[in-house]
Amino acid sequence: MKCPSCQHNGSRVLDSRPADEGKSIRRRRECEACHYRFTTFEKFEEMPLIVVKKEGVREEFSREKMLRGLIKACEKRPVPLKTLEDMCFDIEKELRNQGVSEVKSELVGEMVMDRLAKIDEVSYVRFASVYRQFKDINVFIDELKDLIKKER
């Protein structure tokens, strides 16, 4: 690792600790030549996870995009932000653990709806109405009936 002060190629590690929820390592280093101290971060390269949309369009998975949709569905509902963040983290982890580079958007949507139904039914119906593109009140009523059946 080159020293940012003198450009010498040698440094020694003084301290290492996990960072970014364990996804990287923070290292405190000291240059062997000028004794300048600096911090580096070591991070493994994550393979991108691609979401294949219904129309065949491919885009990189975004936990932030999923969280924004959930926040919108849970607006004015008693659902803590931390719960939604944890849900997004768990879904991403589960998708990455499948060991595939591409997933269908339908799978992601179903995973979100399964979890959201257990957290808040009103938010679930809001999310489902947008995700499944309810065309009229009858489709909405059918979804509510399915939700009631699942509870029993």
Swiss-Prot record:
- Which stretches make up the ATP-cone domain? 49-139
One Gene Ontology BP term is: negative regulation of DNA-templated transcription
User: Which InterPro entries does the UniProt record give?
Assistant: ATP-cone_dom, NrdR-like_N, RNR_NrdR-like
Superkingdom of origin organism: Bacteria
- What is the name of this protein? Transcriptional repressor NrdR
**Where is this chain compositionally biased, Polar residues type?**
1-10
Query: Is the keyword Nucleotide-binding in the record?
Result: yes
